[in-house]
Regions:
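N-terminal amphipathic/basic leader segments beginning at the initiator methionine
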Residues: 6-53
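Glycine-rich phosphate/diphosphate-binding loops that line cofactor/substrate pockets in enzymes
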Residues: 58-74, 99-105, 280-287, 313-314, ...
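Membrane-embedded hairpin module used as a gating/binding unit in multi-pass transport
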Residues: 218-296
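N-terminal glycine-/serine-/threonine-rich phosphate-binding loop
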Residues: 33-68, 275-276, 299, 311
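An acidic, phosphate/nucleotide-engaging active-site surface
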Residues: 119-188
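Internal metal/ion-chelating core segments
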Residues: 170-252
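Short glycine-rich or small-residue beta-strand-to-loop segments that form or flank ligand, phosphate
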Residues: 72-83, 108-115, 289-292
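C-terminal non-catalytic interaction/assembly regions of soluble proteins
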Residues: 98, 304-436
Length: 436
């Protein structure tokens, strides 16, 4: 999808697949940011980085010092939607538990998938690797959020019922492995999210997520005062998660850095480090934001760039969202629901009451939340979607405008907004826009 040049101001670009799209801004548009975060290289030796983190835990004794002979241990790891190098981390953790007197036959592995689809045994084997699959033969389980034997362990201080996987509830020592990345509602992923939503029941996750998803402080790059995050911490504490290993991972799925230790302490440091990599400061809210989904361009992941753009665009402004949508099958149910006349708030109320549309029930709760966010974006902004993978009719069902070319989209918006403060995010899929 090439750019188109005209008699305008200087050229800019966004990343699109393996190419760059050049474009020109109208002369009445004032650029307030066009920062493109450079790629961050991975460490030379991922296993060495894992060992370093485990040898120097933050706010916690080492795993070897937490473990006692006779303990039953639950090792929690994230699902196939995350690039976390579980196959490297788990053998090292198993070896440390062995040295502390806990044999493999007293250790279970649990895939903390939240409400995502349950993986097959072969998919679990791919995630944990041959060695761990063999060592924990018959003791690697996917969490089932709908299981009748999930265990109620209490309520958060705000009243959310916390119901978790029985193998976690009845273990003596619980250790988690995951990834810390910017998260649009929890501030950052990682930490206690391995528990909530990771191993919680569907009704617990629905109660938490649907209740707090639109709170003003439920947003990226905010932990203190973020009710969505604070409820996750409450659930994690109730679960007794003792130790967490979180990774910062780049676009090439390489380990940048690992953090380990107390689930709150290590997550704070991991979040701070992640923010240092991805934050783009803005002096004001933009009238127009031009954002590319790159590098998260596949399926529902492509929506992250649009959500982030909403944080830094003024109400009534415009967002130009650029995404190839070459594998768009996974967002078709979202598009179908967007075609209804129901407002964001009315749809949200349905979810709170447990009335989830039948065609969305097989999807995870985070997917269903996207419908609310998209409806809200369509109500709050003029969104122009630049794509080649969706038809104009499909884009219009989302209440967005369609364009096949970026320069054409800019021209459309500039007709109604000849003067505007503009933010450009060439790689909008992995940024944290922060308005000062």
């Amino acid at each position: 999808m090439p750019g188109k040049k005209g008699n305008m101001s200087m050229a800019h670009y966004v990343n699109y697949g393996n190419e760059k799209i050049d474009f020109l801004l109208p002369k009445g548009w004032n650029l307030i940011s066009a920062e493109d975060k450079p790629p961050v290289p991975g460490v030379a030796d991922s296993l060495q980085e894992i060992r370093r983190a485990l040898d120097h835990p933050i706010g916690s004794p080492k795993i070897e010092d937490l473990a006692r002979p006779g303990m039953e241990v639950a090792l929690l790891f994230d699902d196939l939607q995350r690039p976390t190098p579980v196959h490297l981390a788990l053998p090292e953790i198993l070896n440390r538990l062995n040295r502390a007197g806990i044999p493999d036959n007293r250790i279970s592995g649990i895939c903390s998938l939240g409400t995502h689809p349950i993986p097959t045994l072969e998919q679990l084997k791919k995630k944990v690797g041959e060695e761990v699959f063999s060592r924990l033969q018959g003791r690697i389980f996917p969490h089932d959020p709908h299981a009748s034997d999930n265990v109620i362990i209490g309520r958060t201080h705000r009243g959310t019922l916390v119901e978790i996987n029985p193998r976690v509830a009845f273990s003596d020592l619980i250790i988690g492995v995951g990834e810390c990345m910017p998260h649009p509602t929890a501030g950052f992923g990682g930490g206690y999210k391995i528990i909530m939503p990771g191993v919680c029941s569907y009704r617990s996750v629905a109660s938490h997520h649907f209740t707090w998803m639109r709170h003003r402080n439920s947003k990226v790059n905010l932990l203190d005062g973020n009710s969505f995050y604070e409820e996750i911490v409450d659930a994690g504490r109730l679960s007794r998660l003792a130790f967490k290993l979180d990774f910062i991972i780049n676009d090439k799925k390489e380990v940048i850095r690992a953090f380990a230790g107390n689930p709150i302490a290590e997550h704070r440091e991991a979040s701070h480090y992640s923010a240092s990599l991805y934050t783009i400061p803005l002096s004001k809210l933009a009238d127009v934001t031009i954002t590319s989904a790159f590098p998260l361009e596949v399926g529902v992941q492509a929506t992250k760039a649009l959500t982030m753009a909403g944080f830094c665009t003024r109400s009534g402004g415009a967002i130009i969202w650029v995404a190839p949508q070459k594998e768009a099958g996974s967002i078709m149910p979202l598009i179908k629901e967007m075609g209804s006349s129901e407002s964001a708030s009315d749809f949200h109320r349905r979810l709170i009451q447990g009335d989830v549309p039948d065609h969305l029930k097989s999807f995870g709760i985070s997917y269903i939340m996207q419908v609310v966010y998209f409806k809200e974006l369509a109500e709050k902004f003029r969104v122009v979607h630049v794509t080649e993978g969706l038809s104009p009719e499909q884009v219009k069902m989302m209440k967005f405008s369609y364009s096949s070319r970026l320069q054409e989209a800019i021209n459309q918006v500039s007709e109604k907004m000849p003067k505007a403060d503009v933010a450009v995010f060439p790689s909008g899929g992995n940024i944290i826009p922060e308005v000062k």
